[in-house]
Amino acid sequence: MEDIRRFLHTLYGLFEKGTRIRGILGCFLGGLFLNILIELMDRKSFSAVLVLLESHPLAFLENVLILTFSLSLCLFSKRRWFFGILIGTVWLGLGIANLYVLSYRVSPLSAIDFAILQLDWSFIGIYMSVPAFILLVIAVILLLAGLVMLFKKCPKSPVHRLFNTAVSVILLCACIVIPYLPTSLGFGENTYTDVIRLTENYGFAYTFTRSLVDTGIDRPEDYSARRVRAIAAEVLRTKDKAPEDVPNIIFLQLESFFDVNRLKDVTFSENPVPYFEELKETCPSGYFTAPSVGAGTANTEFEVITQMNVHDFGTGEYPYKTILQETPCESIAYDLKKLGLASHVIHNNTATFYDRNIVFPKLGFDSFTTLEYMNHVETNEIGWAKDKILTKEIVRALSETEERDLIYTISVQPHGAYPEESETADIKVLSGIEDPALRGQMEYYATQIHEVDEFLRTLTDVLTTWEEPTVLVLYGDHMPSLEISKDMLDLSAGGLFETEYVIWSNCGVGGADRNVKAYQLSSRVLELLDINVGTLTKFHQLNPWRGAYETELRTLQYDMLYGDRVVYHGEQPFEETDMRFGTRDITVNTAYVRNDMLMVRGKNFTPYSVIYVDGNAKETTFLSEYAVTCAADGIEKGDRVTVRQVAEDGTELSEAIADPYGD
């Protein structure tokens, strides 16, 4: 009895002073205000915020409590006002950043965006004008100055550590427990990991926080060696199968490409994609369900290359930025090596975006040709490389090897952000879009995909006469980041997650049309070629795409990447490849000084070639693919002269070595 009395006395003491209650009450009110403000920026109307409150009240409360918990951390400092304002400013900044992100794409801001952010002007300049960037820098400077002044001037308050700890722990526990309450209480089913649906149904603060901590594939409840063997039994029994004459296989992933003729009641001055529509009529084709809308190219790549479902991973996760940083993963590149195919990736953008330069060796590719290894590249109005350069690069990859090739090609031309006014938009919207801004963006986009359509015709013309049997698989990686709603689409022709794919060949490959998800495309292509090699190729081909199929696929994925690798008999059978950049060597033949300039001559230089003298980069002028030059200041006999290919972000990709200067 005495113990109970002592406990009650302690509780009374905790709540005795009003300052303690005022502190946590202030955090709660601050969290409520921040949540309303952030959701208002995300949903762009107060009525939409009320819809969230009415339809998912527990989700609304969850967001408020997450914000309250983060604000409550300020109570552990004597300068609670400063740290409270600092934490609130961070959340407000995230809300503003989300508002800006949603102005040029469909998917909301998530934690992974900070991992893939490129802080170089070649990237930032596409999404932000110079005046806007200057204003942003000024705003950040003023904000930092204001925070410094606040830190110096703000009053100090007593810290009640026991009370604050108790409250923070209660808030944290509530944040963890609420999402797992019964759906009837108002939170709803939240097992999916797509940030668009999560943010729409459960709010920005919850989704963003979840994207911070939710990575990888959760261990299935029934995971065991016996369970994996049961799932993979037929896969393990099935022998590899392939025809004697395996063709070249080219995957062509078209950036933000879809047939705009699917838009209801929208007419154009001419058909933007006549050749693509012709291909759909004459080749095996179907709808292609991408893992995201308006963004997420790397996840579409991941699904096609590995045949894994990215939605089984964490919220908004890009496996390129997590598990594939360290762990090799079975892929079509590894699998087709068994059949003697060399494997290449071609991308007319920088090598380092999404850490592709790090990831592709872990997916088994032999070479990676990027913008840094291309010459005579034309760019569109907003700076993206035009896709027609890819024809030459694909032919070069086919020519450089004696064996047959797997070529995974990633285009970039129709990438956003789309300008509302364009000087180069030749195709006009005649009717169906009233908003002038969207109409201008659509005209620019239609013009870009029209050029891509012409590139497709040129590429297939070249491949038609290619001496080796060749299969070309082309598809849009996701819908463009335009304000296209479901109401604007003929839903009988696919929804917002559906683009289309076509399988073309110069060797008579045929087959019935079939709709696929991104992670099913490769097995579909290989099935038409009578190829059955690799764990997931066999799994997809041997199983009907229904019933327990998705659950069993998830278990296999967990086992292959995070589990005991039962399907591989407990081993890691895949080694990172010694991937080269480009398919041709960059060579240095001579280096000499003339008129106070160091001239370096060789082969296959590009505008991304940089001269290094004893390891120090020099400001380099690109003259031609045979010569680059820099100032000869300070260069002495015996200095080591090299030429390296350097990405926009400063990453050194590869190197050619010259003889010491003067020898």
Predicted regions and their residues:
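Transmembrane and membrane-interface helices of multi-pass
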Residues: 2-198, 637-640
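N-terminal leader/auxiliary helical segments
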Residues: 3-16, 20, 24, 132-145, ...
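Membrane-interface micro-motifs in multi-pass membrane enzymes
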Residues: 111, 196-204, 294-295, 385
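Alpha-helix initiation and N-capping motif
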Residues: 114-117, 201-206, 225, 273, ...
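Residue-level preference for non-acidic, small/hydrophobic
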Residues: 120, 249-254
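Membrane-interface segments at or immediately adjacent to transmembrane helices
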Residues: 178-251
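Solvent-exposed soluble domains appended to multi-pass membrane proteins
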Residues: 236-244, 254, 259-663
